[in-house]
Amino acid sequence: MLDINRIVQNPEELLSTLQKRGVVSSDIEAKIKSVSEKQRILKLEVEELRAERNRVSKEIGIQKSQGKDITEISNSMKGVGDRIKSIEEELTKEEESLHELNLGLPNLLDPSVPEGKSEEDNVLIRQWGEIPKLSFEAKTHFDIGEKLGIFDFERGVKLSGARFYTYRGLGAKLERSLMNLMLDTHTSENGYEEMWVPVLVNDESMTATGQLPKFAEDFYRLEKDGLNLIPTAEVPLTNYYRDEIIQEKELPISVCAHTSCFRREAGSYGRDTRGLVRVHQFQKVELVKFVEPEKSGEAHEKMLQDAESILQKLKLPYRVMLLCSKDMSSASSKTYDIEVWMPGLGRFMEISSVSNFKDYQARRGKIRYKSKEGKNLLVHTLNGSGLAIGRTLAAVIENYQSEDGTFQIPDVLKPYIR
């Protein structure tokens, strides 16, 4: 959700963002200007009528005190009151129309975001670690896991359908160990407060973080209850402060949570149909920050390093990519992807997205802070995966595999395995 006054005063900024994102923008600017101008005229008219009503009310009081007949002047005021009511109703409709239009607009792009058409245009920022040179043909994590009996995809399908799975024994222990490593690192070393949050949220929450109204087909909904299964803990963590005013001295606020995440993965059929890469239910540790606007750029870089720290502890090779304009989520102003090397798949795989939303989500969710000067201002929100646990486990198996079809456990995880 954008600052409409800013858009009206500088429409080129929005048009540039829409063009770079590949959004059809032929009439968006005209609609915003038309509705905004109509609002301005209606507000002016209602202010003039209210001023007239106040003036006449004073005149009625004077004439009444003088014993004069006020019937005619009182009758004239009834029409003014009816007109004010009519304009206020029309104004409410225009405000709702503008609000709905604004909800569908993407975030303005940060100036540093490269223009591009696809992931091929993303920019490499850095690469960490050496890609392992195996003396044998690398196997995939799902082949290794199934052979060792720590994954069971067949029974996952039996229980729930395609893109579901189960862990057994060491598989379940490794998932739990990775979760604990991530939470311990982020809370003890990276400065986050751990939270526990619901995985079912209302529509207001999904709207504030940008999933609604645009991406309703991408998540699971409990229609009878009016609740939605979260696609990421970003939703409840960010909405924790929805409709609230935070004191400036409390900022920055850094929180993290481990949750199950649920995604329909609509439109992804045929891609990564095997293994832990693209599934309907998975575990993830999420990082969220609330900061003052002038500090969000620095906070973004710090959050990126926090997510990277997990891969460095696990000694997994990865690269950081700055996403181009058409490969970003519509709510993000700037996004980095962390991609881990997967020997079995023979490619890098996204394992974390770290995004700066600036005031886009805060405006939708009315998340503000009171400055030292006493002004209520919008915070900037950021979030990132720290990390997706199933994908991290897949990367561990593929990078630590042996020729005999087994794999080693990273040293940093051994204290967590009992």
From Swiss-Prot:
It is an enzyme of class 6 (ligase). GO terms for biological process: selenocysteine biosynthetic process; seryl-tRNA aminoacylation. It catalyses: tRNA(Ser) + L-serine + ATP = L-seryl-tRNA(Ser) + AMP + diphosphate + H(+); tRNA(Sec) + L-serine + ATP = L-seryl-tRNA(Sec) + AMP + diphosphate + H(+). InterPro entries: aa-tRNA-synt_IIb, aa-tRNA-synth_II, aa-tRNA-synth_II/BPL/LPL, Ser-tRNA-ligase_type_1, Ser-tRNA-synth_1_N, SerRS_1_N_sf, SerRS_core, tRNA-bd_arm. Keywords: Aminoacyl-tRNA synthetase, ATP-binding, Cytoplasm, Ligase, Nucleotide-binding, Protein biosynthesis. GO terms for cellular component: cytoplasm. Pathway: Aminoacyl-tRNA biosynthesis; selenocysteinyl-tRNA(Sec) biosynthesis; L-seryl-tRNA(Sec) from L-serine and tRNA(Sec): step 1/1. GO terms for molecular function: ATP binding; serine-tRNA ligase activity. ATP binds at residues 263-265, 279, 350-353. The keyword Cytoplasm applies. It is found in: Cytoplasm. Catalyzes the attachment of serine to tRNA(Ser). Is also able to aminoacylate tRNA(Sec) with serine, to form the misacylated tRNA L-seryl-tRNA(Sec), which will be further converted into selenocysteinyl-tRNA(Sec). Homodimer. The tRNA molecule binds across the dimer. Consists of two distinct domains, a catalytic core and a N-terminal extension that is involved in tRNA binding. This is Serine--tRNA ligase. It comes from Leptospira biflexa serovar Patoc (strain Patoc 1 / ATCC 23582 / Paris).
